[in-house]
């Protein structure tokens, strides 16, 4: 039976690796990445020997592909940085994946905004009551 502390340890290591990769992208990445890159999350198995790194990249599809390719090309360098910073017994093998969650949130917000504008256009007197309460 697994120890309950193992799950907490894995989560802690995932957070530390996420922060360390983000730090590397800010300080150690010499080549400018296309788009705005954010490390969204890191997922690791119990043995901590691999890490799936989910990144959110704001930009068009070409920028996203270029940034993801560049991250994967430099994965070994990032792994070395993690090894030095975190002093882990085994440095995990990094694999980068595009995280679509941020993109989906932005799409939903845009749709909600458009619906709100449409509602106000169909009911012009409805939105002006808010200033009367002050």
UniProtKB/Swiss-Prot annotation:
Top-level taxon in the UniProt lineage: Bacteria
Subcellular location(s) per record: Cytoplasm
Keywords (A to Z) from UniProt: Cytoplasm, Ribosome biogenesis
Any one GO CC term of the record: cytosol
Keyword Cytoplasm in annotation: yes
GO MF annotations in UniProt: ribosomal small subunit binding
Entry keyword Protein biosynthesis: no
Stored Pfam families: RBFA (PF02033)
BP terms from Gene Ontology: maturation of SSU-rRNA
Similarity comment: family membership: Belongs to the RbfA family.
Subunit structure as annotated in this protein's UniProt entry: Monomer. Binds 30S ribosomal subunits, but not 50S ribosomal subunits or 70S ribosomes.
Role of this protein: One of several proteins that assist in the late maturation steps of the functional core of the 30S ribosomal subunit. Associates with free 30S ribosomal subunits (but not with 30S subunits that are part of 70S ribosomes or polysomes). Required for efficient processing of 16S rRNA. May interact with the 5'-terminal helix region of 16S rRNA.
Identification of the protein by name: Ribosome-binding factor A
Organism ancestry: Bacteria, Pseudomonadati, Bdellovibrionota, Bdellovibrionia, Bdellovibrionales
């Amino acid at each position: 039976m697994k120890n309950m502390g193992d799950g907490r340890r894995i989560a802690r290591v995932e957070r530390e690796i996420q922060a360390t990769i983000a730090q590397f992208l800010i300080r150690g990445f010499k080549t400018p990445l296309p788009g705005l890159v954010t490390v969204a999350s890191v997922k690791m198995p119990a043995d901590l020997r691999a890490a799936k790194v989910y990144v959110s990249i704001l930009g068009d599809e070409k920028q996203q592909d270029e940034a993801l390719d560049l991250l994967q090309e430099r994965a070994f360098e990032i792994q070395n940085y993690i090894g030095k910073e975190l002093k882990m017994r085994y440095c995990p093998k990094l694999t980068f994946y595009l995280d679509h969650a941020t993109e989906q949130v932005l799409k939903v917000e845009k749709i909600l905004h458009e619906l709100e504008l449409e509602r106000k256009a169909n009911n012009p007197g409805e939105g002006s009551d808010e200033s009367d309460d002050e």
